[in-house]
UniProtKB/Swiss-Prot annotation:
Family to which this protein belongs: Belongs to the CbxX/CfxQ family.
Family matches, as PANTHER family: AAA-TYPE ATPASE FAMILY PROTEIN / ANKYRIN REPEAT FAMILY PROTEIN, AAA-TYPE ATPASE FAMILY PROTEIN _ ANKYRIN REPEAT FAMILY PROTEIN
Gene: Rca
Residues bound to ATP: G73, S74, P75, G76, T77, G78, K79, T80
Protein name: Ribulose bisphosphate carboxylase/oxygenase activase, chloroplastic
Source organism (scientific name): Cyanidioschyzon merolae (strain NIES-3377 / 10D)
A single cellular component GO annotation: chloroplast
Higher taxonomy: Eukaryota, Rhodophyta, Bangiophyceae, Cyanidiales, Cyanidiaceae
Amino acid sequence: MSIPDDKEAGTIDEFLQKEGVLDILQKLDHDLVGLKPVKDRVREIAALLVVDKLRSRLGLTGTTPSLHMAFTGSPGTGKTTVAMRMGQILKAMGYSRSGHLIVATRDDLVGQYVGHTAPKTKEVIKRAFGGVLFIDEAYYLYNAANDRDYGVEAIEILLNVMEEQREDLVVIFAGYEDRMNKFYSYIPGISSRIGNHISFPDYTLEELVDIAKVMVRDMEYRIADDAIPACRAYIEKRMQMPYFSNARTVRNLINRARMRSAIRIFNKAMDPNADGLVSRDELMTLITEDFPTVQELLERGETAIVE
């Protein structure tokens, strides 16, 4: 087989620019605060795909690497966001027809009676063809305590599709790392089909505060400088409590602060002794009293924990 001149391949930078991969990676940086190990792994996968494409253009032999993945980590650490961006990368580089993301759980795949599971699972897979199927908390597909559980049928269908139609579907399993490892021990065929494992660490306190700032900015709000300590104190205490969900908990906090801000502004506007005027800056700024205090968090007890 003749090999084309090296110039036909172009530089990797030119390839990344032309295919839009650099833009997608930059969006990932914007979407996610911190998570450097995750971003590095995504870049490694992108690099492998880029080199594979360049080799193909030069007539060099090669095989498409396994693109099925496992994302492990706590809730709210960006797994779904990374899955969405990964789908876009795969589409940009020609490894996926559309790159769209379908998110599914056990309820979407497993039926409640005999003959119900296969149609449900196949319908979800059909919608995901050409893109990425993201199965959240995948370990719930298998119930070790019930050998007649219908989840086994869904798993068998998934395993077959992952092997026989891997060029038209990327499957990403997600969940807590310890539970995923146990899941692999029950269903060894899954682990052998996964080519890329990405671990998502919990955010640090300062990263969560930065996430809060990004969230309000995207909503066209801002946190007043003297309100940052109140925001930080709430997050720090919440991190020590059960059911903490990283960025999801921060989003809940911001939504609560927005609600308190709205009530504060509304009450001020309705005050008969006030002029009723509301400035743009007031509408955009979250102040200290808009953030629940640590004492309020503790007094609310379980209602705060189960967000």
